[in-house]
Amino acid sequence: MQTTSLTALVHEHLTIAREASSGRSAHTVYGGHEHTLRQTLIAIASGHHLDEHESPGEATLHVLHGSVRLTAGDSAWDATAGDHLVIPLDRHGLEALEDCVVLLTVAIQG
């Protein structure tokens, strides 16, 4: 079994996100096209966001660092480090209220 230090990845990818013109950095922690379960660590610098997009399937978001706002239609949910959100199946987006890192877990059926 392989272990991964999420704490180390948080620091590494926050540094990358802060320096990137997009304000973001991502790293696949587990999964890929050959797996149903996919986990991606996403770092977003304060003031940046992920544009609204379609849901790929059942998904959750675990905030590892900072604070975020998840939006879907007219609804919005704020979350801080340690919070866990179930992502709606509707179109949604994610805004960094401050430098943040989240662990996105998606189950792809098919």
Predicted regions and their residues:
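A short, N-terminal "cap"/entry segment at the start of jelly-roll beta-barrel domains
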Residues: M1-T36, T71
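Conserved short histidine dyad/triad with adjacent acidic residue
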Residues: G23-H27, R38-S55, A81
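Short beta-strand segments in beta-sandwich/barrel cores
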Residues: H48-L50, G66-T71, H92
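Glycine- and acidic-residue-biased ligand/ion/polar-headgroup-sensing regions
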Residues: G57-G73
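A cytosolic small-molecule/anion-sensing beta-strand core signal
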Residues: L64-H65, T80-A81, E98
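Short acidic-glycine-tyrosine-enriched beta hairpin
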Residues: G73-D90
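Ligand-binding loop in jelly-roll beta-barrel domains
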Residues: L89-G110
